[in-house]
Amino acid sequence: MNATTAPLPYSAARLHELAHVLIANIRELAHAGWTPATSSNFSHRLDEQHAAITVSGRDKGRLVEEDIMVVDFDCLAVGRPLRPSAETLLHTQLYRRFPEICCVLHTHSPVQTIASRLYAGSDVIRLEGYELLKAFEGNTTHETAVEVPVFANTQDMQVLAAQVDALLDKQSMWGYLIEGHGLYAWGRSMAEARRHLEAFEFLLQCELELLKLRGTRQVVPVPHS
């Protein structure tokens, strides 16, 4: 390091490690078709004041280490003058609020986007009775319900973040939808965030398929033996 170079306020080694974790997982989600047209954004807590996050406008299926940047929890770029996602605040608000949260994933699969449009007027999607509800941290039985909030889309992230915070004041949750947009899911690790994301995707797809069936024929409950 020369005399004119200020030390980085975060661990470069840790950033290198997290960049590869992010890239590997994001590539899988991109190949699944959940990040079309450079959409979606992903982050991982770097330390108590910083997060590693995808640079805006990059093809998520072809990310390299330079496509992962650092922001502080005020959403300011740190280390390199790159542009983070316009939705960075929706990541950092979770890191600020929950010290245990280490990963936030935002995707735009067709299932997520269609469900967000279909249920926009209801403000929530109620998932109930599914065995896979146990995929969400804290759930130990299928005999429960998980409500997925559906927020109105807006380009004003301050407004949306305030709405998310207001709901978090009232209930615990592991994700939410934005109308006509996509899904946010998070967890205490990349593995847990992926599990929550995949569980939401599967359960939302089940709900959409049930709606199709109910639209064409009556669904008769199967009696328990």
Swiss-Prot record:
Q: Which UniProt keywords apply?
A: Amino-acid biosynthesis, Lyase, Metal-binding, Methionine biosynthesis, Zinc
Report the domain of life of the source organism. Bacteria
Q: Which reaction does it catalyse?
A: 5-(methylsulfanyl)-D-ribulose 1-phosphate = 5-methylsulfanyl-2,3-dioxopentyl phosphate + H2O
A single GO cellular-component term on record: cytoplasm
Q: One of this protein's Pfam families, by short name?
A: Aldolase_II
- Note accompanying the cofactor annotation: Binds 1 zinc ion per subunit.
- Amino-acid positions noted as binding Zn(2+) in the UniProt annotation, renumbered to this chain: 106, 108
The protein's GO terms of the molecular function aspect are: methylthioribulose 1-phosphate dehydratase activity; zinc ion binding
Q: Which Enzyme Commission number(s) are listed?
A: 4.2.1.109
Which Gene Ontology terms describe the biological processes this protein takes part in? L-methionine salvage from methylthioadenosine; monosaccharide metabolic process
Q: What does the record give as its pathway?
A: Amino-acid biosynthesis; L-methionine biosynthesis via salvage pathway; L-methionine from S-methyl-5-thio-alpha-D-ribose 1-phosphate: step 2/6
Q: Which cofactor does it need?
A: Zn(2+)
Q: What does this protein do?
A: Catalyzes the dehydration of methylthioribulose-1-phosphate (MTRu-1-P) into 2,3-diketo-5-methylthiopentyl-1-phosphate (DK-MTP-1-P).
Which family does the record claim for this protein?
A: Belongs to the aldolase class II family. MtnB subfamily.
Name of the protein in its database record: Methylthioribulose-1-phosphate dehydratase
Source species: Xanthomonas oryzae pv. oryzae (strain MAFF 311018)
